[in-house]
């Protein structure tokens, strides 16, 4: 079947004040505090947020001493929920916890030398923390090798937060969402068909004022002018009002924005969430590694886009499979690239952790505006330092 060349594609993002993102941030703040005190911490931390309360639960084995109340309140305060007028208050919300240690059966499979498959004399290594399939994706339509739709959606959500925190638009509240539809012609991004922004705001603000401010200070600052035209549609708070937001408007849960966190519907997703998980959990670390590999393949110039898949079994260090698909854009066969990945890179959890330096307290920064496509110093998986592995592949 021939590939469709003319189509519309949409991606969404959310702000750090979205209830699910509050939970991601709290879970990763707990993880960061564990890793700060004990880099070998095992963490699986879930958070729920609803009106007036936060619940932290999970399995954590660590030498760290944790003040869950402080971690949760500091995180919510940083996001900006500091008054009951907003529907949530960092200083008055209840913080509950239910934490156990990691299951000894899981520990046996993960800890080097304990399990059936990670204790052979030739391969004493940490086993994968779970089974699963993990994907990474990259495309050369933006400077960060991310799909344009999710890139724009993230930047709009990020800008929405910035104008709120900088008080450029002083009636905005923390909760918000963005969505971008791009028209593709002959397989290339041609124009922006639609922009959706939903932003929480103070009561009594005229809807026309919100529309004007969001267009001026958010959309026009982010969306390329040459991709906006007279037919571009704008949907700004399309219900007419968004006063009730955050956990009062919707219950929040860790791990419920996996497509926002990855590629906005492009590529593929194995189903595992990221936040609250230490790097022995391949749901997180192997996805970061897959992005690293895909980005370096595309950055090398040997392909225009790349999808990389790894698969793991719990307790087994080596991946069960390595897959590369460049959608016919590569200068060599995809199996050549897959063989390079398999032979030249250590894809065990220990190898990934070492290469990407993942036992650091870096994770709360990942929770909003994309785990991928932001070239922050801590985001080692965004480096293109192995592109030469692929540049001259034959």
Swiss-Prot record:
Pfam family, one: S-AdoMet_synt_N
Membrane-spanning parts: none
Top-rank EC class of the record's enzyme: transferase
Residues at which L-methionine binds: 59, 102, 250, 281
Entry's EC annotation: 2.5.1.6
An individual GO BP term: one-carbon metabolic process
Region (Flexible loop) residue spans: 102-112
The family this protein is said to belong to: Belongs to the AdoMet synthase family.
PANTHER family: S-ADENOSYLMETHIONINE SYNTHETASE (PTHR11964)
Known partners and oligomeric status: Homotetramer; dimer of dimers.
Protein name: S-adenosylmethionine synthase
Organism, scientific name: Brachyspira hyodysenteriae (strain ATCC 49526 / WA1)
